[in-house]
Swiss-Prot record:
One of its GO terms (molecular function) is calcium ion binding. Its main location: other. SUPFAM superfamilies: EF-hand (SSF47473). May be a component of the linker structure that bridges the ciliary membrane and peripheral singlet microtubules. The keyword rRNA processing does not apply. Residues 8-17 have a biased composition (Basic and acidic residues). Keywords: Cell projection, Cilium. It is found in: Cell projection, Cilium. Residues 1-32 are annotated as: Disordered. This is Sentan. 'Sentan' means 'tip' in Japanese.
Length: 147
């Protein structure tokens, strides 16, 4: 968990009135340097209250930071971004779910009504729903915890 970074997707620029939107835009300006995204582990380390937290608290804080880093200025997450996070940041829990009706229903909901966005509570429910039905959770339950 510590050291994981959220990656962002490249967004192409389309100039209004450009007859060829797929062509790369040209500019006489020097390219701007984009600030580097700070890793989740460094963001966690910067929160003083988290220094003495339990693993569970750090796990929830990590989820909250990933949500915040991916959400818009209103604190809402686009459904397409939520789906991308499931496929990139939560893939081990989602793996093997493709044939399960409930999983297909969840993905279908993310594909429909894309104008609706998720708040943090909805995002957590989404993650928990996939976790509960995942094969990985079964493997975790089978881990030996005592000698």
């Amino acid at each position: 968990m510590g050291g994981c970074m959220h990656s962002t997707q490249d967004k192409s620029l389309h100039l209004e009135g450009d007859p060829n939107p797929s062509a790369a835009p040209t500019s006489t300006c020097a390219p701007r340097k984009m600030p580097k995204r700070i890793s989740i582990s460094k963001q966690l380390a910067s929160v003083k209250a988290l220094r003495k937290c339990s693993d569970l608290e750090k796990a929830i804080a990590t989820t909250a930071l990933i949500f915040r880093n991916s959400s818009d200025s209103d604190g809402k997450l686009e459904k397409a971004i939520a789906k991308d996070l499931l496929q990139t940041q939560f893939r081990n829990f989602a793996e093997g779910q493709e044939t399960k009706p409930k999983y297909r229903e969840i993905l279908s909901e993310l594909d429909e009504h894309t104008e609706n966005k998720l708040d943090f509570e909805d995002f957590m429910i989404l993650l928990l729903s996939i976790t509960v039905m995942s094969d990985l959770l079964q493997n975790i339950r089978n881990v030996k915890i005592m000698k």
